[in-house]
């Protein structure tokens, strides 16, 4: 898979996407890095620790989050993306489901669009990604948790997302998929997805797994968000053992 100027050997390696939320309210690091200097310092820490991709988020996607305007999100993410582009030779992802934000981020230097709605929230998102031939991570998500056959339904939903990408002209080697742990799923469904996360690979694209500090871990271990490091590591290793090419 090609992201920016780098080729990722997704069949033989697992790569790390480092989270950098420039938000006041993200549940894992909200408020810590919402100044340019603090964000840049954290990016340097991640680079020193071997991160392969920076993932920049300007709006929290935690349960109950408050949606912000496109303009405010752009004001949050564009300065840090532009700065990272000049400081590091590391691909940059923008975590957004809004096409206006994605386009501004790409123009500032983003190499990948990480869309938690898999092209289904903003009908112009696929067009923007195709226009710039940017890489994309397309996540499974739903507004409800009503499934007939959970794993099969998730695969069918992702097939719809892939079709949207293809219709827009997004090339196969620009696509990765995310099973969407913690999004549109109950606690039990999240556990089942962890058990069968390798099923996502049958669709023919690299898979990204993101479990960092999520409620599934908290409910299993009865721990608050700031004490879920070990659970995050365990679920990440499970994903690696099951063939995930990227972990977030």
What are the roles of these predicted feature ranges?
Residues 44-48, 159-174:
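Phosphate/pyrophosphate-binding loops at sites that engage ATP/ADP/AMP, CoA/4′-phosphopantetheine
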Residues 16, 21, 26, 54, ...:
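Conserved, well-structured ligand/cofactor-binding cores
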Residues 1-24, 166-170, 223:
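N-terminal amphipathic alpha-helix/helix-capping segment at the start of soluble metabolic enzymes
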Residues 41-57, 243:
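Catalytic domains of carbohydrate-active enzymes, especially glycoside hydrolases
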Residues 9, 16-40, 48:
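N-terminal binding-site loop/beta-alpha segment at the start of enzyme catalytic domains
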Residues 1, 9, 46, 51-53, ...:
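Active-site loop-to-helix "anion-binding N-cap" substructures in soluble metabolic enzymes
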Residues 3-5, 28-37, 41-42, 61-83, ...:
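Active-site-adjacent loop and "lid" segments of alpha/beta metabolic enzymes
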